């Protein structure tokens, strides 16, 4: 890490810092990616710091006396600063600092007392007399010069009680561009050892300013934030010491926030449409004035934000539709481009204002697998400023403006809440009920923050170190079905443990605190797996029959045919995110993916898991081979390749805790315990091959699916008893029934086939929400009848003749309200069609839809099309039947079908 090397150079040869005496330093506030502490007291206050800006470097000391008290540090600092300009440069020293020059008389450095000149290589000055030359010093620093600035701001703040110290203290006019600020807080002194690494402390994770005055200005005349309507915003995460929330939903989600950055300011609005809303104009006008800081300069607004231009022009400022220019006072843009990222950051750091609007949720949805924190364009601009846009969504609403006193003292802020939790862990201080209620948000924010993966930032690495220490101090709950996680604190620790493991420099040291019981399973070396794939429009999981234990690392040798072609490795079959559940029986996310972007890839997963190759869509390979360096053998039966004898003799006893059965059209994955005593996997294969061919038969599809369906049985799933998708997820308790052939023929498998039916549903003949839980049951009915010989009356308790009759009567007695036509009630309509016309009619209807174009998007249009399609298949006018059921059959549909004989004696004719 570059910052660590900088620290070693600056503190070389120093064992301790004796700061005792009358000199009371300022506590320094650090922001951004480049600033790092050199000296920190036990209260977490930073008393010395260093940073980079442009091509130059800067060292900041919290009191001017330190310039003479620590000559060794000053010499180290000069050595560190000098490489930017060449070691033959002159060290300029402010006239009042003659003693500093005298201390350097015996050093190899050439010094010169006097005012700043840009010919100097380095300039040493106090923090009180730089205001007049601030612009020159910043330009000098940016061009590669070195600065040492020393002083304290607490006495200045006493003399200027109405002034904003962060903004107006003279020293901050210079060093703030590098992310270092003198604060009005007095630093506690003493004798402190110099740590080997950059100092950090949970106490240092604090907010650097009271934002009361800022909020008073921004919220003047603002009583509410009206974000009602169709605009869907993102959440803003506020993570910097000088960043603060402005507008927050009742459940604590920020959608407008501000920050100080360098000498400038920024406000982020999590939907660009908000900037042009009349209902938010009072706030927006305040915001643009806060950003302008009284300069009355030009406000540049990107040309596509015409509505924002209309609103902001009411401020009385000179608002112009223009691209970015350095001569602007405030720049207004969206977060969807980072084309001028560095220029915008520099513009703000050197005093400009930035109003940026946009959401990240659509980008996140269209860039699956990408990291919103590091890859979303707007976050390239915002992260350094202590703000970022998250990938989740926030609906609109009418939200009260925050009560300022309460917001400043009790409002949620990531840094202050993290500090409070660290205090709770290290000192046993009880959390208030309000703070307990914030733990879930803290866990989410910790995960988001860690995803920045900014390992060259001292601020980031200090949070990683803090969270690692918390994990070691508290431990992570050993979540399982017998030990579920329920309390907010346990939720938080599970979340933190999972996420910090991914980014800590030493994950192996954390592993025993996260997973305490890790069985030592026997492994295979250099396992070879042949890969064949011919994918259609979707990606496909390819099983390997191999498993990695929790935390186990391995290398995979990848054939050049698939390197860099969007192939991935996935570890773990449980892809459901159960983070929304109040009770957890496993961690929320337990799988991991790695791109195959080189011929040798290292993979691992905290929670372990089966190893899969993920073939991208529209890909064809035949027999390429991967080699897995070390892995655990899993029980894996594949029809046509695995013999029953081999299965019984040894494969089913393979040590991995997850097993797979792969058949012609279906792959099942579940706990190995469910198949240890399975003697006839071939009989299970025969059953499911028959079921799956029957499913494709009703769907009027070829008997071999383009992609095999998957079942995964897990201890907990994201919703429902089972749910459709790829894979279809179900609870572990359902797994034994999938392989019990005798029981299946006796009682059927309604639930599993219901989910397979969901995967056959097509939007062109679906009428959501009415038929969402209805038409999938056609496959359950068909399979039970054709495969199990179970008639509909016995296939499910909800469709006995008595239940059907009673439900139908209730529907029609209630006025055949289509809002009540759903699930079992809707299924009755389709069952009546099937009982009259048979299954072949459905097959023909589905077949016609395969290549149909011009299908309406609305339910009414689709229902009329369905009525016409079914009528033409059976050569009867079904309009009377569908009208009787309350379908919105249109006159032109009746006209189009009028040449066909009407089905007048249909089962609900008495209700027509």
From Swiss-Prot:
GO terms for cellular component: plasma membrane. SUPFAM superfamilies: Class I glutamine amidotransferase-like. SMART domains: M60-like. This is TRPM8 channel-associated factor homolog. One of its GO terms (molecular function) is transmembrane transporter binding. PROSITE patterns: PEPTIDASE_M60. May play a role in the regulation of the cation channel TRPM8 activity. Belongs to the TCAF family. Residues 539-838 form the Peptidase M60 domain.
């Amino acid at each position: 890490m570059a910052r660590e090397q900088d620290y070693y150079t600056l503190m070389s040869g120093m064992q301790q810092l004796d700061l005792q005496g009358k000199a009371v330093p300022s506590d320094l506030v650090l922001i951004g990616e480049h600033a790092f502490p050199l000296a920190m007291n036990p209260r977490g206050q930073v008393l010395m710091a260093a940073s980079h800006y442009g091509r130059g470097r800067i060292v900041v000391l919290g009191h001017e006396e330190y310039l003479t008290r620590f000559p060794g540090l000053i010499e180290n600092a000069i050595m560190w600063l000098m490489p930017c300009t060449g070691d033959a440069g002159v060290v300029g020293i402010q006239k009042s600092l003659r003693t500093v020059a005298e201390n350097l008389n015996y050093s190899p450095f050439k010094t010169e007392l006097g005012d700043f000149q840009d010919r100097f290589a380095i300039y040493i000055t106090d923090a009180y007399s730089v205001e007049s030359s601030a612009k020159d010093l910043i330009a000098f620093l940016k061009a590669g010069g070195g600065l040492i600035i020393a002083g304290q701001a607490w006495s200045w703040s006493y003399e200027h009680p109405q002034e904003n110290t962060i903004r107006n203290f003279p020293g901050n006019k210079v060093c703030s561009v590098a992310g270092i600020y003198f604060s009005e807080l007095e630093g506690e002194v003493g004798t402190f050892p110099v740590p080997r690494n950059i100092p950090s402390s949970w106490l240092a994770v604090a907010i650097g300013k009271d934002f009361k005055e800022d909020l008073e200005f921004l919220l003047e005349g603002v009583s509410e934030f009206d974000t009602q309507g169709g605009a869907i915003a993102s959440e803003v995460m506020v993570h910097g010491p000088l960043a603060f929330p402005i507008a927050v939903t009742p459940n604590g989600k920020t959608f407008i926030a501000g920050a100080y950055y360098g000498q400038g300011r920024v406000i982020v609005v999590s939907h660009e449409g908000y900037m042009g809303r009349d209902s938010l104009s009072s706030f927006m006008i305040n915001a643009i004035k806060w950003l302008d800081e009284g300069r009355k300069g030009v406000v540049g607004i990107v040309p596509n934000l015409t509505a924002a231009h209309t609103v902001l022009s009411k401020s009385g400022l000179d608002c112009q539709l223009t691209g970015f220019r350095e001569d602007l006072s405030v720049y207004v843009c969206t977060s969807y481009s980072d084309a001028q990222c560095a220029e915008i950051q520099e513009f703000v750091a050197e005093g400009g204002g930035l109003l940026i609007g946009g959401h990240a949720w659509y980008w996140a949805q269209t860039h699956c697998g990408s990291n919103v924190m590091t890859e979303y364009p707007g976050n390239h601009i915002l992260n350094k400023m202590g703000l970022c846009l998250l990938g989740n969504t926030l609906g609109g609403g009418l939200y009260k403006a925050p009560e300022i006193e309460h917001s400043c003292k009790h409002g949620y802020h990531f840094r202050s809440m993290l500090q409070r939790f660290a205090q709770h862990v290290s000192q046993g201080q009880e959390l208030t009920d309000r703070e307990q209620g914030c733990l879930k948000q803290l866990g989410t924010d910790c995960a988001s923050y860690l995803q920045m993966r900014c390992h060259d930032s001292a601020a980031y690495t200090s949070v990683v170190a803090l969270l690692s220490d918390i994990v070691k101090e508290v431990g992570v709950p050993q979540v399982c079905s017998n030990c579920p996680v329920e309390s907010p604190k346990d939720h938080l620790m599970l979340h933190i443990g999972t996420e910090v493991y991914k980014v800590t420099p030493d994950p192996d040291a954390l592993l025993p605190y996260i997973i305490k019981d890790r069985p030592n399973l026997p492994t295979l070396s250099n396992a070879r797996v042949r890969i064949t794939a011919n994918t259609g429009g979707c990606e496909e999981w390819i099983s390997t029959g191999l498993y990695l234990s929790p935390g186990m690392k391995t290398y995979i040798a990848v054939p050049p045919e698939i390197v860099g072609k969007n192939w991935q490795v996935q570890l773990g079959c449980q892809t459901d995110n159960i983070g929304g559940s109040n009770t957890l029986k496993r961690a929320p996310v337990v799988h991991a993916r790695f791109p195959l972007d080189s011929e040798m890839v290292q993979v691992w997963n905290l929670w372990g898991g089966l190893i899969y190759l993920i073939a991208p869509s529209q890909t064809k390979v035949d027999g390429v081979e991967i080699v897995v360096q070390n892995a655990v053998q899993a029980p894996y039966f594949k029809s046509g390749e695995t013999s029953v004898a081999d299965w019984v003799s040894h494969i089913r006893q393979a040590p991995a805790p997850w097993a797979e059965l792969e058949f012609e059209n279906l792959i099942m994955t579940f706990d190995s315990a469910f198949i240890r005593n399975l003697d006839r996997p071939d009989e299970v294969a025969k059953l499911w091959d028959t079921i799956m061919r029957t499913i494709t038969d009703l769907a009027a599809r070829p008997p071999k699916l383009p992609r095999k369906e998957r079942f995964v049985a897990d201890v907990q799933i994201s919703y429902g008893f089972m749910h459709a998708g790829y894979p279809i997820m179900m609870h572990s308790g359902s797994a034994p029934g999938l392989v019990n052939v005798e029981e299946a023929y006796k009682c059927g498998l309604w639930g599993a086939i219901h989910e397979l039916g969901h995967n056959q549903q097509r939007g062109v003949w679906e009428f959501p929400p009415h038929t969402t839980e209805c038409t999938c049951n056609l496959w359950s009915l068909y399979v039970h009848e054709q495969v199990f010989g179970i008639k509909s009356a016995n296939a499910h308790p909800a469709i006995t003749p008595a239940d059907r009759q009673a439900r139908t009567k209730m529907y029609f007695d209630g006025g055949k309200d289509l809002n009540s036509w759903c699930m079992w009630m809707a299924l009755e309509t389709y069952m009546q069609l099937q009982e009259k016309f048979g299954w072949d009619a459905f097959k023909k209807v589905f077949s016609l839809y395969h290549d149909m174009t011009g299908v309406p998007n609305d339910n009414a249009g689709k229902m009329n099309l369905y009525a016409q399609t079914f009528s033409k298949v059976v050569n009867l006018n079904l309009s009377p039947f569908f009208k009787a059921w309350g379908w919105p059959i249109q006159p032109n549909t009746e006209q189009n079908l009028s040449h066909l004989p009407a089905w007048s004696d249909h089962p609900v004719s008495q209700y027509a």
